[in-house]
Amino acid sequence: MGIGTRTVRRLGLRVALTILGLLAPALVSGVAAGAALEPIVNVSPPVVSGLAQVGERVRTTPGDWTPAGLTFTYRWLRDGSPIAGATSRSYKIRVEDLGSALSAEVTATDATDQTGTATSGPTRPVRRGTLDVLQRPSISGVARYDHRLSADPGRWAPKVKNVRYQWLRSGDPIAGATKASYLLAPEDLGERVTVEVTARRDGYLPGTARAKRTKAVDHRVPLRRMVSYHVETRGKITADLATFKRLAQETYDDARGWRSAGMGFKRVAKGGAFTLVLAQASWVPRFSSVCSAEWSCRVGRFVIINQTRWLHASPAWNAAGRSLRDYRNMVVNHETGHWLGHGHLGCPGPGKLAPVMMQQSKGTDGCKLNPWPLRSELWAHPSGKLSQAPADHDARVWVD
C-alpha cells in the first residue's frame, strides 16, 4: 500500500476522510466520529417573580445552564399541570388560577436537539386581584330637596359590570338608598351628600370608591320672600309656650312645607306680617263668631291654633293612628295656608294624599292623612307680595 494522508474537517455533521486519494463520507451526530456529546446540565433552577394574584403578570428566568449557547422554551404549570397556551416567558394570571400554585417549566435545547428540563419552585397560592379606579365615581343633578341625583360608577381596571351603590349623608349611610339615583329627602337639608360605589368582578376583591360630595343640600326652590311673624297667646295656656314656638318654626323651616313654595318665615318679638296665636279653646270664638271652640281658625292677620287640638290632635287623626307631631305640622301649615291665600280643597281621589288645605281634622273622605302641601298647592299669590296676606282674603274667616 502506498503512502497516504488523513485529513479531518468538520462541516456541520460531515467528516471527510481522504486515504490514498479516495473520499469516504461519514455522518456523526453533532461531533466528529468517536467524540462524546457534552451533557446539558441545569446549574440553578428557573426563578418566578411577580405578585401571585389574579390579573397580575408573573415572569420566569431560564435558570443557569451548561454548556453555553442553549436556547430555551417555556411552559407554565398550574398545580403541576400544563396550562393550555401558556408558553411565553411571562404569564398573566387568570381567574381559573385562583387558589392554585404556579410554576414555570423551562426546556433547554442545544444545536444537536439534545434537551434538558428544569422547573421553578411553586408560587404561593394565587390570591384574588385588586380593582383599580381609573376615574372616580361622580354625581350629577341639583343639590336641592325633592330633586334627584344620579351616580356615574366611574371607570375601573379591569372593566366591571357589577356595581352597587350606597348613598351617604354627611358620611353616614342613608337607609334604603342603594340605587344609581337618589331623591333628596327633607333630612338632607343642609347636609352634603355623596355616593359610594362598590365594584365586583370574579376573581377580584371588591373595590370601593366615593364621589366628591355635593354642596350643602338646599330647599327645593330659592327663597323668594321672607315673612316675619310673632307669637301671642289667648286665655289660659297649659301647653309649653317655648315648645310651641320651636315646633311651629320647625314646621315653617321644613323642606316639605311652604318653604317649597319659596316662602320663608322668621319669628320676631313683635309686629310682623301676621300673628301666630296659641289660644285656649274657649277663646277661639272671640276672634269671630264663625270660629269654633272645637277647631283652629284664621281671621285676618291672626293664625289661631286651638290649644286642645295642639295638645291632643283630633278624633279623626287619632283614629288613623297618626302622630301628634304630624298633626301639629298639619294644623300650622293649614292655617298659615289660609293666610297665604289658599282656600279649602277636597279629596282628589280615594287612596291619594289629602291636600294640606283639606279639613283633615274632621276627616279625609278616603284620602290619606297628610301634613304637608302637595306639589299642586305650592303656588305663590299672583301679586308676588307675600309679606302680607292677599287683600282679597284679609277679611275672610276660615274654620278648621
Give each language-model segment a name.
Residues 1-21:
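N-terminal export and membrane-targeting signals
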Residues 97-99, 188, 222-224, 268-271, ...:
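Extracellular/periplasmic catalytic domains that process cell-envelope and extracellular macromolecules
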Residues 250-259, 339, 343, 360-363:
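Structured segments of extracytoplasmic/periplasmic soluble domains
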Residues 293-295, 299, 303-304, 311-313, ...:
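Metalloprotease/metallohydrolase-associated module, dominated by Zn2+-dependent proteases
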